[in-house]
Amino acid sequence: MATEVMQENVETAANVLNHWQGHRRVTRRTIDAFPEEKLFQFAVGGMRPFADLVWEMIRMVMPITDGVATGKWEEFKGEKPETKSELLKVWDAQTKALDERFPTIPQHRFSEVDTAFGQWTMTGLATIQYGIDNEIHHRGQGYVYLRALGIEPPHFWERD
């Protein structure tokens, strides 16, 4: 008698997108918690201001998504925002673009190995996870800044 093994893929593209967008919602609330001047100027221990860290996140989101989708790895093109409202406007536009673009990634691209931006050789899914991990890491720096400013950061588990 043969035993049949069923494998269920619980890491669907929709789950990955939902997970990523959950983190993006928390990061957006983190950006919003900063006073305008502190967002662009305050830093601790020689680290960059949070606005610079957010700009790095912004410069990764769509290039990673498009690169995984197409295999073409192009740098982000856009002007760096100079105000909190401009930064949030770019963030929100990317959130919408991510919702539109992510579902078009061909399923096979998640498991294909590629070299993103000529430097990271990994599967498409791992590249996306790298982008998410980078956001979490930098948001953690933002939490330290907020606490140093006497501001309670948003709860990281509230992703809605």
Regions found by a protein language model. Name each.
Residues 2-3, 13, 17-31, 36-79, ...:
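Short, contiguous alpha-helical
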Residues 8, 19-23, 90-93:
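Soluble or luminal CAZymes and related metallo-dependent hydrolases
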Residues 35, 99, 103-106, 150:
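Secondary-structure transition/hinge residues
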Residues 66-104:
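Helix-adjacent hinge/juxtasegments
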Residues 103-118:
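Acidic catalytic patch
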